[in-house]
Amino acid sequence: MGAHLTHLARARPQPLTQHQRTQKDTMRLQKTVTVDKPLDAVFDYLSDFTTTTDWDPGTVTTVNQRGDGGVGTAYLNTSTFLGRQTQLTYIVRELVPGQRIRLQGENKTLTAVDTMTFRGVQAGTEVIYTAEFTFKGPARLLAPLLRPAFKRLGKQAQTGMHNALNQL
């Protein structure tokens, strides 16, 4: 019996590493939109992040604070989520014309990384939109509870993006 207890003591879970905590606290959504529109037109439209007001149902406003849309451009995004209004400052971190744009948004409770990857396909253009949300501080405890609401928002944004791109 003593040996069995010693084995249990050694099998105790170890604290999570910073990487493991970050993975656990990060929520990832990925949606694909395919439209019968030219790649250049789709890229030009979506790389202007102020257009989120057209297709993201949570966005109230997105204002270009500084920059020409390229790397380093800053956008102030005001969104409503579960009845609360919040602001994130997004910075364009990567922009490869016609291929990819990656933005990072921050506020005191959340870091969001939004990546849009573009590909010409027979039907027109395919956009793969990936959003990763990493919660900070006490908000980390709410992450698992918010997952269903974020998934709903992702589906609504996918539909909104599809509709907006079809208007181009």
Predicted regions and their residues:
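Beta-strand/loop substructures that line and gate deep hydrophobic ligand-binding cavities in soluble
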Residues: 104-156
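Glycine-rich portal/gate segments that line the openings of hydrophobic small-molecule binding cavities
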Residues: 63-109, 126, 156-168
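Compositionally biased, low-complexity flexible segments
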Residues: 11-13
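Hydrophobic/aromatic beta-strand elements that line small-molecule binding cavities or substrate pockets
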Residues: 31-33, 88-94, 113-120, 131
